[in-house]
Amino acid sequence: MNVTDLPNAIFLMGPTASGKTDLAIALCQTLPCDIISVDSALIYRGMDIGTAKPTAQELALAPHKLIDIIDPALSYSAADFCRDALREMNDIVARGRIPLLVGGTMLYFKALLEGLSPLPSADPAIRAELEEEAARLGWQALHDELVRIDPVAGARIHPNDPQRLSRALEVYRISGKTLTELTQVQGEGLPYRVHQFAIAPSDRALLHKRIEQRFDKMLQSGFEQEVRALYERGDLTPHLPAIRCVGYRQMWDYLAGEVEYDEMRYRGIVATRQLAKRQMTWLRGWPEVTWLESGESGNLARVVARAGVA
């Protein structure tokens, strides 16, 4: 099929605090678009303030798919995202509208665009086995095992990253092949004509300032109470992906008495800036993307003109 015969989709990517949501809502008021969130933190229920989840007013203007879809105790993989996003995209197109995918989780965008490698599904029995070994021997011993069987993954994955470390070992124990071997097998690409845009301020100091202001606004809006409710549930730990989200891990440490309030605030801002830096690193190497300056009045018209879907 010729690429011009494929259905249209728009990607609006960018670091945290870059103005993606405002532009996305404006696009929905201009084009027949429906928003799909591409954010590994917005998927969790009960995590609204620290994730800067769209407000009720914003959601009334432009509903978002794939937010508030799972409990923080559960995990959600890039494969889960691809399955859910493609289902939503196909549904949107079937209604004669355009999927507008908005967010900053670049791994999700990449997986959706290029297709995922054929990795085996999680195996609870093997996960439990690895957890038991880690409790008995320590994560460093498991990391040493990974280095022996898959030096490339071992060099990339830190011993203090139990989620990724256990996944790499799990893949090997299930399939007999290393994570490095399997990820070299390309999946199926996205059957859409994708128009890709990245929005960010060109002045890094401005982005840093916006991040600091946003974090302080979260603190003023009840972020501590939000995380305390999660903390007091009793079934959540700092090792879960939800609690490892930027801001939540730092507030969790504060509630556990491990750091003072001012240190928590400082660490939360630094962690958010580091996240933005990683997002920008991804985007600078992203092919076929049109860059937009945060806050520029002509961004809406530029997206409409470039996408050519009006």
Curated annotation (Swiss-Prot):
Substrate binds at residues 16-21. ATP binds at residues 14-21. Its EC number is 2.5.1.75. GO terms for biological process: tRNA modification. Residues 39-42, 163-167, 244-249 are annotated as: Interaction with substrate tRNA. Keywords: ATP-binding, Magnesium, Nucleotide-binding, Transferase, tRNA processing. One of its GO terms (molecular function) is tRNA dimethylallyltransferase activity. It catalyses: adenosine(37) in tRNA + dimethylallyl diphosphate = N(6)-dimethylallyladenosine(37) in tRNA + diphosphate. Its cofactor is Mg(2+). The record marks 105, 127 as: Interaction with substrate tRNA. It is an enzyme of class 2 (transferase). It comes from the Bacteria. Monomer. Catalyzes the transfer of a dimethylallyl group onto the adenine at position 37 in tRNAs that read codons beginning with uridine, leading to the formation of N6-(dimethylallyl)adenosine (i(6)A). Belongs to the IPP transferase family. This is tRNA dimethylallyltransferase. The gene is miaA.
